[in-house]
A protein has these predicted regions:
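Sec-dependent signal peptide recognition
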Residues: 1-8
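Structured C-terminal subdomain patch of bacterial secreted/periplasmic proteins
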Residues: 24-25, 118-128, 137, 212, ...
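A short, structured surface patch at a secondary-structure boundary
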Residues: 25-91, 185-188
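Short helices/loops that flank or line small-molecule/ion binding pockets
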Residues: 75-83, 103, 199-209
């Protein structure tokens, strides 16, 4: 069972940093920094998150994000919010970052986390830039404790296929791949030489005969790119073995919410093992 994480700056009563170390008005422009900031920031410190943070299909903290004004990553609107710190991801449009910097606003960029260790690194980084080191340390301790419980469990690893729109898959050097590995599943992408992302043709997937096929939940509206995950071959594989349609919001960002994704995959692994003679 995943214990409730302490959210929205109320991190289990952790003490706040000295006032001189704390930026008073922080704006986040990126979905992943949005969530880390909501977890670590002190009361009233975070003044805006990106509009994507309110999207329940993408954000694990959509309900919490409703309490914050949103921005659309535009330099002009962010400048008018009068922030003394802007936090964002490394893939944010460089023109926006450069404009804010020229306007005298400090911008800190976060690299995406692709491993469990990098998740704790990003939490620590967020604590440092917000002047909330003790809050971040408390969150890291909670995350590491729950993660260790998953990693302690050993056993045979069922073969799992991550299969998304257009036949896209992710290897072990991605966050999704690390979620599978931590949950005790073997990612078949490695069998085809994928450490990052790549495409597995449908016929190759059929011949691979994975023990489970894991797909993303479809977005509203019809998309040709998603038709492949509804192909009869996929249906046949699903009927033969337990399968899963994952909650994308828990898998997108390197935050403590990956624990929920791991928990789901552990449950899937146990179901497969129970069904295997």
């Amino acid at each position: 069972m995943i214990h409730a994480l302490c959210l929205a700056g109320a991190l289990c009563g952790a003490p706040v940093a000295a006032v001189s170390d704390v930026p008073a008005r922080v704006v986040s422009m990126n979905l992943c920094t949005d969530q880390l900031a909501m977890l670590v920031a002190g009361a009233g410190q975070l003044v805006s998150v990106s509009h994507v943070a309110r999207d329940p299909l993408s954000s694990a903290m959509a309900k919490e994000a409703a309490a914050y004004p949103v921005n659309h990553g535009l330099a002009e609107e962010i400048y008018l919010m009068q922030p003394d710190l802007v936090i964002t991801g490394s893939f944010t449009a460089r023109a926006t970052v450069d404009m804010l910097t020229r306007l005298g606003i400090e911008v800190v960029m976060f690299e995406p986390a692709a491993t469990m260790a990098q998740i704790t690194d990003r939490i620590e980084q967020m604590g440092a830039v917000l002047g909330q080191q003790k809050r971040a340390a408390a969150l890291i301790t909670e995350f590491d404790t729950q993660l260790a419980a998953f990693q302690a469990e050993q056993g045979a690893r069922p073969r799992a296929a991550l299969y998304y729109a257009n036949g896209y898959t992710l290897g072990d050097k991605t966050l999704a791949g690390q979620i599978l590995t931590t949950a005790g599943l073997a990612n078949i992408a490695a069998e085809y030489g994928f450490s990052g992302g790549g495409v597995i043709p449908l016929e190759v997937l059929a011949m691979a005969q994975p023990d489970t096929v894991i797909t993303g939940r479809p977005y509203p509206g019809a998309s040709r790119s998603e038709e492949i995950v509804r192909h009869p071959v996929i249906d046949t594989l699903r009927r033969a073995h337990p399968d899963a349609s994952i909650s994308n919001s828990d898998w997108v960002c390197g935050t403590p919410f990956v624990l929920r994704a791991i928990d789901d995959m552990v449950a899937l692994r146990r179901e497969i093992q129970k069904a295997t003679p």
